[in-house]
């Protein structure tokens, strides 16, 4: 039997270590926020913000309304550490697949036991 193992490249390791040094904790939950869901950040206290453009070699989101930052904190009134990715990456932005799922890789490497992904979707109904 061959066991699959999560592999992180050198640049990802630099990114992860940068984030770890700022949050100085192990988040138990990672949440990828979809468009319009950044108000969930208000549920946190003791907040630390890490803009994507400050993380060495990290890609930038190009979608309007995506802040492009990690937001770490504890859920208000608890000691539950959570990290939000406020701004995600899409294949239609012309990115390679490895960059589309980089947020999940980072949450995994930070030690998140649970990962929640969200999105905003809609449809057009012809009248």
Regions from the language model: what does each represent?
Residues 2-127:
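Metabolite-binding pocket within alpha/beta catalytic cores that recognizes anionic/polar moieties
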């Amino acid at each position: 039997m061959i066991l699959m193992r999560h592999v992180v490249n050198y640049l990802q390791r630099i990114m992860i270590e940068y984030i770890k040094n700022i949050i100085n904790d192990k988040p138990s939950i990672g949440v990828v926020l979809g468009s319009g869901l950044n108000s969930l950040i208000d549920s946190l206290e003791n907040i630390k913000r890490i803009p994507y453009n400050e993380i060495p070699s990290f890609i930038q989101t190009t979608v309007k309304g995506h802040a492009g930052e990690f937001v770490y904190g504890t859920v208000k009134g608890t000691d539950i550490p959570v990290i939000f990715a406020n701004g995600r990456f899409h294949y239609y932005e012309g990115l390679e697949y490895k960059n589309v799922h980089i947020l999940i890789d980072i949450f995994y490497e930070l030690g998140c036991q649970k990962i929640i992904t969200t999105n905003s979707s809609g449809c057009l109904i012809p009248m």
